[in-house]
């Protein structure tokens, strides 16, 4: 039977400090017994010295030095079952939808099993999100980790929900599931997420974890690990293709900073812990495809850049670990364009692995490159027009200036419930490219122009 210690020496913020007489494991779960018989759970953060540091999930309010501490010898585990699908849970895995507790097939350590790098397969299959700026120009590939860089006041939550509703792997026989984890959200946002999932029917194939802003910061650190453990279970035990959406990683990083300050750690850049890069990697690197497994785990972490600063440590470090970024732009949002995704600073490093003949369409890469080039030139010309006026532009420059407006209005802009197939996206791309003279389509092979250009199709 586990011993009960009454050796709490200090209580600081969400942490308690306990003297130990026996070895205690890192990440071990702790039960804290209060005077009225109430039991709270905690987790060991540091056991390297004679004093054990324990973070308390429910907060330390009401605790005193006379409380009993029991080290369980177990790590935090997720009750894993296929019954997770269709459920809305708290950040620590407790039911938030009024339903019964999950009856587990397995109890899985939320820190995940180590993935052998040699067993990883390169991502190569296209995932259709139904959003043209992602599918057409910054394609998401199965097994990839592709973050969305947003900022406060921008509609990243709406984009996340739209992807959760619409995402699919065209032509795949395996089932598709979404694991959605929200961290540090308000009650209003939680109600919005819950009602959207239930109203649209997306909940049937989803597992939702919601950690509220007034929940303990400690739970915020647990939430993404709960979500990723659920995703790995569905992918590797049930052969499903799982898309994990984590929002907002900034709130997660703030919780890390708060915990570091409570432990009197030496801070790194802008007060964040020096190990934040490593910690974020333990989340992002759980995406992938494993040799011999039918399923896969794909990640879309969403983070709001403090002060719209892409060089802030959170987006900066995330960019080193992940495989590209989708950038949500305030400028496009001010124009009333949804989704306000700016394709120029956006990038999917694995895009070329997931597009082309047999995956999307043979002309996909060429159309994407040509739209990028045309839009970039049009944006540059807007700066020139602001100085010299439109009258100074040549006919060619005027065409590119108009193309930039067309690109934003026809290609970028789409409805919040508009689910475009990859064929729809490429067709819109070709329609707006007709505004440019054919001799300016230098990035598209002539055989694709003859086959797909609307002017040539009409002629046939």
Curated annotation (Swiss-Prot):
Source domain of life: Archaea
GO cellular component terms attached to this protein's record: plasma membrane; proton-transporting two-sector ATPase complex, catalytic domain
SUPFAM superfamilies the record matches: C-terminal domain of alpha and beta subunits of F1 ATP synthase (SSF47917), P-loop containing nucleoside triphosphate hydrolases (SSF52540)
Transport as UniProt keyword: yes
Subcellular locations according to the entry: Cell membrane
Membrane-spanning parts: none
Record PANTHER family: V-TYPE PROTON ATPASE SUBUNIT B
Family membership: Belongs to the ATPase alpha/beta chains family.
Name by which UniProt lists this protein: A-type ATP synthase subunit B
Provenance organism: Methanosarcina mazei (strain ATCC BAA-159 / DSM 3647 / Goe1 / Go1 / JCM 11833 / OCM 88)
Gene name of the encoded protein: atpB
